[in-house]
């Protein structure tokens, strides 16, 4: 705890000494404008969790319990207006290795906006992610306890196979983002075509198309899939959106959860009920076809040759999310529910369960520069569950500078989805976060 307090002091005094109250800078030349914006988040996390073995106890390579985390983004939006048409480009730089910022920093892309709507070319974030509403919209802090927790450690495994868990609603913001829990390191998400209608009487809609979610910005080659044997059912050596699992007797399962011809859409409605009351509703969905089949193969222990034993069809992606946020005076509350059904699963491997869903809710109260919130999250992935409660508070020192503190308690219960005979195991823990967000 002393180390956590020391880290908090460093964050606070460094932020106060460096931050200045500024407005977002604009560079304007007649009909051409450049808008510069960005943010920096620094966070220290302390965790206490049961049933961790050996190096599972390490938050970082060489430290237990305490770790630091950062998120950084810088964006420049260049626009040119001719008559009633606005054309421009948004260029986003993320110095850290993982793309983990919010949808408002939705990556570099070209856009064209008219009175009929807005088209985004090459955006890595789809329409459903940008229009989706969750309970976390009203919370203080970051809700990032899952960055420090380890839910699939050695104690939770069976025959060396890990259980699958979801730890935040962010999974549903990118349910086909080329990975199983988060975007792969040093890669961006696949490029998309987005269209958004203008807001009309509180309503706004959007739709996106993604030809291939394996076509990420970080791939060296256009053909991301390097096959060790030819044919559509060949074993892929790719790392993007694919994992290979050892089951028994030298047998493996290769699961490719990339999607082709993916469509996503969303509809939001905002309404000012009175001078002090506002309501926002959202309904979003995603649909797509699996790029490849689940592959059951055997690896020769001597020659390492791969023999394909069988292939199985994965279910289509079918996902939806419902969300609402209500604000009255200083009080806010939000709730959301998301469901992926049996998306991208096959009964030959997902023997324990195939359905995935989540729900969450949050309440918040703000008075002057102080905001406090309480949030609850429940997820179920293949019958493996996570429950988490988070209490957070933040204090606005000046516009753009926001220190925060947060404490979360979580519980995960489950087993590897391939082994229905495995016992369900439980791990619990508490995470404390102290950090500062600087936005300009």
Swiss-Prot record:
| One term of GO molecular function | porin activity
Provide this UniProt record's keywords sorted from A to Z. Answer: Signal
Query: Pfam families, per this entry?
Result: Porin_4 (PF13609)
User: What GO cellular component entries does it have?
Assistant: membrane
Q: Which residues form the signal peptide?
A: 1-19
Q: Which Gene3D superfamilies match?
A: Porin
- The UniProt record lists the keyword Coiled coil: no
Name assigned to this protein: Uncharacterized protein RT0064
> Which organism encodes this protein?
Rickettsia typhi (strain ATCC VR-144 / Wilmington)
């Amino acid at each position: 705890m002393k180390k956590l307090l020391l880290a908090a002091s460093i964050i606070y005094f460094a932020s106060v000494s460096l931050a200045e109250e500024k407005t977002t800078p604009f560079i304007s030349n007649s009909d051409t404008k450049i808008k510069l914006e960005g943010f920096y988040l620094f966070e220290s996390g302390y965790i206490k969790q049961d049933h961790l073995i050996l190096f599972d106890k390490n938050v970082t390579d060489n430290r237990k319990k305490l770790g630091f985390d950062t998120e950084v983004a810088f964006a420049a939006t260049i626009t040119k207006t001719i008559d009633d048409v606005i054309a421009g480009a948004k260029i986003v730089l993320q110095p850290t290795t993982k793309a983990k910022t919010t949808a408002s920093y939705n990556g570099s892309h070209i856009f064209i906006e008219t009175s009929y709507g807005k088209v985004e070319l090459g955006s890595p974030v789809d329409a459903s992610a940008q229009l989706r509403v969750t309970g976390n919209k009203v919370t203080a802090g970051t809700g990032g306890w899952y960055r420090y927790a380890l839910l699939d450690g050695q104690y939770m495994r069976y025959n060396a196979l890990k259980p699958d868990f979801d730890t935040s609603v962010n999974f549903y913001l990118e349910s086909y983002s080329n990975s199983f829990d988060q975007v792969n390191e040093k890669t961006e998400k696949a490029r998309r075509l987005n269209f958004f209608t203008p807001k009309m009487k509180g309503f706004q809609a959007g739709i996106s198309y993604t030809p291939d979610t394996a076509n990420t910005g970080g791939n060296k080659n256009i053909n991301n899939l390097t096959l060790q044997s030819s044919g559509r059912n060949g074993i892929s050596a790719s790392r993007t959106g694919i994992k290979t699992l050892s089951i028994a007797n030298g047998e493996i399962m290769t699961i490719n959860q990339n999607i082709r011809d993916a469509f996503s859409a969303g509809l939001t409605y905002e309404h000012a009920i009175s001078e002090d009351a506002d309501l926002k509703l959202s309904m979003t969905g995603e649909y797509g076809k699996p790029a490849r089949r689940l592959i059951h193969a055997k690896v020769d222990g001597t020659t390492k040759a791969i023999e394909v034993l069988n292939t199985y069809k994965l279910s289509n992606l079918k996902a939806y999310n419902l969300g609402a946020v209500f604000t009255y005076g200083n009080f806010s509350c939000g709730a959301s529910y998301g469901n992926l059904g049996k998306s991208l699963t096959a009964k030959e491997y997902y023997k324990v369960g195939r359905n995935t869903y989540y729900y969450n809710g949050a309440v918040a109260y703000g008075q002057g520069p102080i905001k406090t919130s309480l949030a609850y999250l429940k997820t179920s992935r293949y019958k493996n569950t996570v429950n988490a409660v988070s209490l957070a508070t933040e204090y606005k020192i000046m516009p753009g500078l926001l220190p925060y503190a947060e404490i979360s308690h979580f519980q995960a219960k489950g087993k590897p989805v391939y082994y229905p005979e495995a016992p369900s195991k439980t791990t619990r823990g508490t995470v404390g976060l102290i950090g500062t967000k600087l936005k300009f």
